[in-house]
Amino acid sequence: MFKKLLGDPNTRKLKRYFPLVSDVNIFEEDLLSLSDDDLRTRTSEFRSKLEKVSSPNEELSLLDELLPEAFAVVREASKRVLGMRHFDVQLIGGMVLHEGQIAEMKTGEGKTLVATLPSYLNALTGRGVHVVTVNDYLARRDAEWMGQIHRFLGLSVGLVQQSMAPLERKKNYECDITYATNSELGFDYLRDNMAADKSEIVQRDFQFCVIDEVDSILIDEARTPLIISGQVERSQEKYKQAAQVVENLKRAIDTSKDGIDPEGDYEVDEKQRSCILTDEGFANTEKLLNVQDLFDPKEPWAHYVTNALKAKELFIKDVNYIVRNDEAVIVDEFTGRVMPGRRWSDGQHQAIEAKENLSIQPETQTLASITYQNFFLLYPRLSGMTGTAKTEEVEFEKTYKLQTTVVPTNRKISRQDWVDQVFKTEAAKWRAVAKETADIHQKGRPVLVGTTSVEKSELLSTLLSEQQVPHNLLNAKPENVEREAEIVAQAGRAGAVTIATNMAGRGTDIILGGNSDYMARLKIKEILSNRLVKPEEGHKPPVSPQRKTKSAGFKEEKNKNLSISKQNQSKSFLNIFPVSLTEDTDAKLASLASKLVKEWGDRSLSSIELDDYIATAAEKTPTQDKNIKELRIAIQLIKNEYEEVLSQEETNVRRVGGLHVIGTERHESRRVDNQLRGRAGRQGDLGSTRFFLSLEDNLLRIFGGDRVAGLMNAFRVEEDMPIESGMLTRSLEGAQKKVETYYYDIRKQIFEYDEVMNNQRKAVYSERRRVLDGRELKLQVIGYGQRTMEEIVEAYVNEDLPPEEWNLTNLVSKVKEFIYLLEDLKPEDLLGLNKNELKDFLKEQLRNAYDMKEAKVEQSHPGIMRQAERFFILQQLDTLWREHLQSMDSLKESVGLRGYGQKDPLIEYKNEGYDMFLEMMVNMRRNVIYSMFMFQPAQKKVEA
């Protein structure tokens, strides 16, 4: 009703951009006739204009003024370099991002290309732009692919990857545009604020940031703070004992009601992800461990037992983690990717290692931490893009002050979303999924099946293998991760079946008929690897659809070849390469391989180096390197031959209905379901989607409550018969909304608590940066000393008492504790002075004593006082900050209980946290001044 009266606010927003789009189109006509060099000079012209402005506001208004022409320049460069022209709706997306908003753009609408527009415009300031992706693979791909446009226009493009050394990182951060993942940016920020020297800092001041898949980073990952930790010593034997003990404990089936424990040793709350021992469980555990009290401070066991229970019940192998090389590696619940190097904190990871009988790594202590919310709020200007933001619009607005604008699609969406099929049992659901997959596959349509865990993907793989359906598996298992790009490249081919764990953030569009460009790259790599790549790295041939896979809980048939039958092989969609190359092309490729061996050496390249050469050759950027030129010609030759077959395949796939997407479980968030649906019907293509669910699915089981339990009893239908019910659909939507609200509250709470830490963190980090910059260190230390003198006077002088009753003897002895050079100071020297005069007198004495100390030290070691000042301030700041982080963690745990005493835990946390921070800063100042006066540089050795 209100929309009709007032108009849709999103439409009103979009109308503002239409005149700007017209301006870009007018500029585009003027640029057509320019040479490449003339087009490139526009960059330096823009930059020279920006150099003349003096304030940030002036700079921003000039950028707005330059926007139409700058966008037209990027569009023209993209046409020349990539052969891709930004659509008008993509220009609108770029304008939304430049204004510091979130652009919601559907899958396949070219978000990656959109990011080039605001990135180029804002990089003209020379202060750096960060383009953030969810994983290293996407950062690398975008830097190579979209970076061509920026390099063509004369801008430098950087890439930060997990394996890079600090010097390399620094060089890449100094580029005009830097591609990186959210975690690399966050960890580099924390490491920079632990640096002992200015030369170790790799990042510049933040300016403008574009986040791809912004909902994944700012919403999904916001529950997990970034933590840098150091090792602490704790008994590893206790983890093993606790793991053995909990195996003998029995889980309670019911939950406690009215304070009465259920039968069993412990309760599990899957919603809160917690395990609680019952009274009976406490008694049994103490008996099994042969201890009197699990909470005994001298011999604490409760922490170990709780973690062991959570490891047993809530952390599931092949769902939450996989075991690889004697390690438990976390699987990201949103993207389905493994996260090597990341560990659960507070002893939880050690409990999982004990459960799996792996080597137990030492426990860690937090050295530095920040949440993604507070990290990204450090950027003066922040923007993001995603296919699904509208459902989280309120959170973006409240937490990040980011508005969301829905950008229209270039073509009308033709996708059909079929009605959900709900089954009573999980087993029936999986049989139905396998049947629909096989049926659609038989029609020659590609099928993408989204699963929620490694375990479930392998279960479906086994069911499809039994039905002789060739398929590819894309999950967190290392052997599958390595094949990710290959698998996605062929996922749109006729009859292709792809099982993928959580497609969120996969970043690669599924092209109907297959991706000829990527297949050509794979082919050239296959040909060149055997001749050019180092023997120890070997070459893994491109993957073909599998029929048999190893699967947990299923018996593997021995001696069965994984390759498909001859009958199936004849179907074009079953091979990674659509057609054998002609003899002429084969001969040219063999000749090229021999030539490159002479140029680059026999088996002398790493696999990554060869990838780099191939990626550069696949670009359209001008190059003088003759080897790259020849590689480029070879890739085009292969691509042309593949294109002939694949274009026909694309026509056939469109004719039979396009890509079919199957969801096998509702995610906790409707947004992630929409992301999976969005894989079908990209850019106006035909496509369809369907979700298969069961009443035993986690979402309904944990959050559906008693209503779903009642439904299970009410539906007296066959197991394999799908259920359709309005009440069931409402229960499902209600459960999802309940989960979204629940997790939003968790993120809000994390943000509110970290906001307290954030102000303290900013104060500590700015103090550190000032020290590293070496600005007026002496004045800073003297300032610390003067504050200490004031605090001593405040502690020992009570103005309510007459001066003769002031405890000047103790005051003087306290001053001497800090400044031993004032050994001649006597209480009688202070007689007759009022409180303020006392402070001024002691401050003056401190300054004189510090000058004496400096003169004495500098005489034998010139310049060492500044080094000592820097060392002691950093040492004290870092040590006390580390201890403070632990104290704040303990405080956070303890204030939670105060809610029972009608006190707001957050206010208690703020007040006590503030007092603790002030105390920390007081201790830091006192320790520094004490250390500086006690400092005795080592005597230089005099050679005989």
Swiss-Prot record:
Name by which UniProt lists this protein: Protein translocase subunit SecA
Family per record: Belongs to the SecA family.
Main location: membrane
EC number(s) reported in the record: 7.4.2.8
PROSITE patterns, per database record: SECA (PS01312), SECA_MOTOR_DEAD (PS51196)
Gene from which the chain derives: secA
Function description: Part of the Sec protein translocase complex. Interacts with the SecYEG preprotein conducting channel. Has a central role in coupling the hydrolysis of ATP to the transfer of proteins into and across the cell membrane, serving as an ATP-driven molecular motor driving the stepwise translocation of polypeptide chains across the membrane.
Record GO terms (molecular function): ATP binding; protein-exporting ATPase activity
Reaction catalyzed: ATP + H2O + cellular proteinSide 1 = ADP + phosphate + cellular proteinSide 2
GO CC annotation terms, alphabetical: cell envelope Sec protein transport complex; cytosol; plasma membrane-derived thylakoid membrane
Superkingdom field: Bacteria
Record's subunit section: Monomer and homodimer. Part of the essential Sec protein translocation apparatus which comprises SecA, SecYEG and auxiliary proteins SecDF. Other proteins may also be involved.
